[in-house]
């Protein structure tokens, strides 16, 4: 073991058998990531939970008693945070987690294993939760191909789909939070969000790895009437 620049002991993984270099580097990063260790201590399912905690600590959109939907929720770190903050376990708030994959139960969270892109998904969610929601969360990332431009388009396309879903299910004044990656490809997305929400900004939590282009788009104050087809709608300032 060696110490890193902060004085912490750093674990180095020796190459063993058929372990690929990419797997070795990923394992080293996981073993040396303080947020991974903290998540285990706090009983959280992923380090990503701290990103939502940081964003909400600053912008305060997860309020007790509100309704939240978490898209692409597995393994459930964001759903855990949302459930705790809105009081879902004691029935004050509601959280619905949606994913194509199965997800172990979380107290206070209703789970729907479905494709949010399906035409009937918004109606099914509204039926489950008993009306429109206050917050839509998305920490989803599109499958990548290794081709930079193709991957950027896939990533932005997924966020655009999540934003369209949010506009179908949000109450006026609602909030949409989604993972994006820094690139020029999301300009159209931001323009559209500024038509549908009062405030739109990018956020980079400290728990997001410094070497990652990952950041989050935070759209607050849903106007209540999606303007997808209104190209002449006035744009709000962020």
From Swiss-Prot:
It is an enzyme of class 2 (transferase). One of its GO terms (molecular function) is rRNA (uridine-2'-O-)-methyltransferase activity. Pfam families: FtsJ (PF01728). It comes from the Bacteria. The keyword GTP-binding does not apply. One of its GO terms (cellular component) is cytoplasm. It catalyses: uridine(2552) in 23S rRNA + S-adenosyl-L-methionine = 2'-O-methyluridine(2552) in 23S rRNA + S-adenosyl-L-homocysteine + H(+). The keyword Secreted does not apply. Keywords: Cytoplasm, Methyltransferase, rRNA processing, S-adenosyl-L-methionine, Transferase. It is found in: Cytoplasm. Disulfide bonds: none annotated. PANTHER family: RIBOSOMAL RNA METHYLTRANSFERASE, RRNA METHYLTRANSFERASE 2, MITOCHONDRIAL. Specifically methylates the uridine in position 2552 of 23S rRNA at the 2'-O position of the ribose in the fully assembled 50S ribosomal subunit. This is Ribosomal RNA large subunit methyltransferase E.
């Amino acid at each position: 073991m060696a110490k890193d620049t902060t004085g912490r002991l750093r674990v180095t993984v020796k190459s063993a058998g058929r372990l690929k270099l990419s797997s070795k580097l990923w394992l080293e990063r996981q073993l040396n990531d303080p947020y991974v260790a903290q998540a285990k201590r706090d009983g959280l399912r992923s380090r990503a939970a701290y990103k939502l905690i940081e964003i909400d600590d600053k912008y305060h959109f997860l309020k007790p008693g509100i309704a939240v939907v978490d898209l692409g929720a597995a393994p459930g770190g964001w759903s855990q945070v949302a459930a705790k903050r809105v009081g879902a376990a004691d029935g004050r708030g509601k959280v619905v987690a949606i994913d194509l994959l199965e997800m172990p139960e979380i107290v206070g969270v209703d789970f729907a294993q479905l494709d949010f892109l399906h035409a009937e998904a918004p109606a099914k969610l509204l039926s489950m939760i008993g009306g429109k929601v206050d917050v839509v969360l998305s920490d989803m990332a599109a499958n990548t191909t290794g081709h930079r431009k193709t991957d950027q388009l896939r990533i932005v396309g997924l966020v655009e789909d999540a934003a369209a879903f949010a506009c179908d299910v949000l109450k006026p004044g609602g909030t949409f939070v989604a993972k994006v990656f820094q690139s020029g490809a999301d300009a159209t997305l931001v323009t559209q969000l500024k038509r549908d929400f009062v405030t739109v900004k990018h956020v980079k939590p400290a728990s997001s790895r410094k070497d990652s282009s990952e950041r989050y788009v935070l759209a607050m104050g849903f106007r209540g009437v999606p303007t997808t087809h209104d190209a002449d709608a006035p744009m709000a300032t962020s």
